[in-house]
């Protein structure tokens, strides 16, 4: 049964560990970038692996492929609008789908163009750590896996547009990993969270374990 968010304000059972104003989410992310937890270590490791694989690919291609480095870079730049137009909305729609699969129905996708960010929230829907893990990783896994498959399917120079989209999406997932990193350092199995539309905030609470 879905937990009621009002239960989290019972100070005999839960303590509030974090309150994030949605307009301040970028400042919060900036404070979570150190690789001092598995989530951020994985994030940096994945992106470093992409860079290494990209350099190996382009080194091979410029010696044997029938296109120039300049052509590859032009196509790479063309992948930027591909990311902005297609993958940013898809990423948030997958977050919304994950919310829906978990049982949330009051889900919104909110653009904040002045801060160059888009995010999905579910009003007063309580998530435990496992549910938040599913929510955070659904777009990362599905989109990046799809793009990696496309690298081996799309021929010639055009795969560099996919490389561009993959780079931008993989690095753009940093907010999801920053939140996972925060949770992983703060008793994750006893921590829950929910979004509040009206206050434009996300709250994190930890269960007081010595209370039944």
Which ranges hold each PLM region?
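N-proximal short alpha-helices
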Residues: 63-71, 107, 114, 150-151
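Membrane-anchoring/interfacial helices and their immediately flanking loops
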Residues: 60-92
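Short, charged juxtamembrane terminal tails flanking transmembrane helices
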Residues: 208-212
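Generic detector of bulky aromatic hydrophobic side chains
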Residues: 86-88, 99, 112, 132, ...
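Active-site recognition of the HExxH zinc-binding catalytic motif
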Residues: 87-100, 139
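Juxtamembrane inter-helical linkers in multi-pass membrane proteins
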Residues: 103-123
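Metalloprotease/metallohydrolase-associated module, dominated by Zn2+-dependent proteases
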Residues: 2-60, 118-207
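Catalytic Zn2+-binding segment of zinc metalloproteases
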Residues: 95-108, 186
């Amino acid at each position: 049964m879905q937990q009621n968010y009002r239960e989290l304000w019972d100070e005999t059972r839960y303590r509030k560990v974090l309150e994030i104003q949605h307009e301040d989410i970028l400042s919060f992310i900036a404070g979570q970038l150190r690789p001092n937890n598995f989530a951020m270590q994985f994030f940096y490791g994945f992106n470093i692996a992409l860079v290494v694989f990209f350099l190996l690919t382009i080194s091979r291609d410029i010696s044997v492929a029938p296109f120039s480095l300049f052509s590859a870079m032009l196509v790479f730049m063309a992948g930027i609008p591909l990311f902005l137009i297609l993958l940013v909305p898809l990423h948030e729609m997958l977050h919304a789908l994950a919310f829906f699969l978990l049982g949330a129905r009051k889900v919104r996708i909110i653009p904040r163009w002045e801060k160059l960010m888009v995010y999905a929230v579910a009003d007063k829907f309580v998530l435990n750590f496992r549910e938040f893990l599913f929510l955070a990783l659904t777009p990362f896994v599905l989109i990046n896996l799809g793009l990696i498959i496309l690298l081996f399917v799309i021929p010639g120079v055009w795969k560099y547009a996919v490389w561009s989209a993959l780079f931008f999406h993989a690095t753009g997932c940093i907010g999801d990993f920053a939140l996972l990193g925060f949770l992983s350092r703060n008793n994750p199995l006893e921590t829950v969270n929910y979004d509040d539309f009206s206050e434009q905030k996300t709250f994190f609470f930890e269960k007081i374990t010595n209370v039944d």
